[in-house]
Each structure stands twice: as C-alpha cells, then as structure tokens.
Amino acid sequence: MPKAKTHSGASKRFRTTGSGKIVRQKANRRHLLEHKPTSRTRRLDGRAVVAENDAKRVKKMLTG
C-alpha cells in the first residue's frame, strides 16, 4: 500500500490551530481593491473558522 499523501492544494489554503480548528483566509481580498470600501477590506482581514461540515472533508485532505 503506498503512502497517503496530503492534498497539496488544501495544505496551501487551510491551517490547523492548536485547539484543532481549521481556519482559512476570507475571500475577495486579493486584487481589485480600489473600488471596495475600506470597511469591507478590513472586515475581510484575518482568518475565518471553516464550517463544521466542510472541516470534516478538509481534515481528511490534510491528514493524507
């Protein structure tokens, strides 16, 4: 049986916290920011916790 591999795309997009939660970056803050209000870009700052149902699938991809 070959070694299980981590999904490389998922490993770039998700991170696990110390408590075991999976976090992600918020969308819509990469480019074309000129016309977006500053309040919106601030709101999109930081990380967001992945929803429970999605977290199960993401965990499977990260553990390999």
From Swiss-Prot:
Protein's recorded name: Large ribosomal subunit protein bL35
Keyword Mitochondrion set for record: no
Domain of life from the UniProt record: Bacteria
GO cellular component, one term: cytosolic large ribosomal subunit
InterPro entries: Ribosomal_bL35, Ribosomal_bL35-like, Ribosomal_bL35_CS, Ribosomal_bL35_sf
Entries under Gene3D superfamilies matching the protein: 4.10.410.60
GO BP term, example: translation
GO MF: structural constituent of ribosome
This protein's UniProt keywords: Ribonucleoprotein, Ribosomal protein
Composition bias type Basic and acidic residues, residue spans: 34-46
HAMAP family from the UniProt entry: Ribosomal_bL35
Family: Belongs to the bacterial ribosomal protein bL35 family.
Underlying gene: rpmI
Annotated region (Disordered), positions in chain: 1-47
NCBIfam families from the UniProt entry: rpmI_bact (TIGR00001)
Keyword Ribonucleoprotein recorded: yes
Biased composition (Basic residues): 1-15, 23-33
